[in-house]
């Protein structure tokens, strides 16, 4: 038995329920790099489960915040949800579950520090949630999420977490114009197991901020931060006349 299988068994025990389809857990803990390095072995990576888990997570947290804070506005709830389920928050939870040591991944990804990469850990948490939802249903999924994220939500409410610049930037610019913000990946560099993405945030046809990161989400957040800080420098972060800044 591999070290990853041993860790997965410990995780299974820690979760505290009997899996109806244990292959879902295996899939949730299989990174795409493992599949790419072992073609022909019938392995399935966790990206589809991540897609599902992302939606389940948003539903559970949205409902929880809606019930927990009946006096908060839609904008406030959106901001709280974004901070609760952002990449750093989910990576922190994944570390608490020791998901990094459970993951099956390719040698190249592992050598480059993939087991500790926030984007991989956050994606693994969402994939695990997707697997739990398919195997156990919504109620157990809700219990799992709220148990894992309760301290994160407390930190969000108390203002102890990093700011969500994407949400803040959108709120500022929409005060003066309904024009949407869009994000685009402008560049990718590095090998498949250690990519760096450069994102741009576009407003009224102009790139108003750029940022880089080891995941698309991180790059977009950095691009939003760049634009937001530029707005602050122009004295517009609390002003209703914000517009294109570059």
From Swiss-Prot:
Main location: cytoplasm
Domain DRBM: start-end pairs: 164-233
Residues holding Mg(2+): 50, 123, 126
Any Gene Ontology CC annotation: cytoplasm
Keywords, alphabetical: Cytoplasm, Endonuclease, Hydrolase, Magnesium, Metal-binding, mRNA processing, Nuclease, RNA-binding, rRNA processing, rRNA-binding, tRNA processing
Active site (UniProt): 54, 126
Cofactor requirement: Mg(2+)
Top-level taxon of the source organism: Bacteria
Signal peptide start and end residues: none
GO molecular function: double-stranded RNA binding; metal ion binding; ribonuclease III activity; rRNA binding
Disordered as annotated region, ranges: 212-246
Role played: Digests double-stranded RNA. Involved in the processing of primary rRNA transcript to yield the immediate precursors to the large and small rRNAs (23S and 16S). Processes some mRNAs, and tRNAs when they are encoded in the rRNA operon. Processes pre-crRNA and tracrRNA of type II CRISPR loci if present in the organism.
NCBIfam families (alphabetical): RNaseIII
PANTHER family registered for this protein in UniProt: RIBONUCLEASE 3, RIBONUCLEASE III
Protein name in the entry: Ribonuclease 3
Taxonomic lineage: Bacteria, Bacillati, Bacillota, Clostridia, Eubacteriales
Gene: rnc
């Amino acid at each position: 038995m591999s070290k990853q299988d041993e860790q997965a068994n410990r995780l299974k025990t820690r979760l505290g329920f009997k899996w109806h389809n244990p292959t879902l857990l295996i899939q949730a803990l299989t990174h795409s790099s493992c599949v790419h390095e072992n073609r022909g072995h019938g392995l399935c990576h966790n990206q589809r489960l991540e897609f599902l888990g992302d939606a389940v997570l948003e539903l559970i947290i949205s409902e929880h915040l809606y019930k927990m804070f009946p006096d908060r506005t839609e904008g406030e709830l959106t901001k709280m949800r974004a901070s609760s389920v952002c990449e750093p928050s989910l990576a922190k939870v994944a570390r608490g579950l020791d998901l990094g040591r459970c993951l099956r991944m390719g040698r190249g990804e592992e050598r480059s520090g993939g087991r500790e990469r926030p984007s991989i850990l956050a994606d693994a948490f969402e994939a695990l949630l997707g697997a739990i939802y398919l195997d156990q249903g919504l109620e157990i999924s809700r219990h799992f999420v709220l148990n894992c994220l309760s301290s994160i939500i407390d930190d969000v409410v108390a203002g102890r977490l990093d700011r969500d610049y994407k949400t803040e930037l959108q709120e500022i610019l929409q005060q003066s114009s309904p024009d949407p913000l869009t994000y685009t990946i402008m560049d990718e560099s590095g090998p498949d197991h250690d990519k760096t993405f450069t994102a741009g945030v576009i407003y009224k046809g102009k790139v108003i901020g750029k940022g880089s990161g080891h995941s698309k989400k991180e790059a977009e957040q950095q691009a939003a931060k760049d634009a937001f800080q530029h707005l602050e420098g122009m004295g517009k972060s609390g002003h209703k006349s914000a517009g294109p800044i570059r």
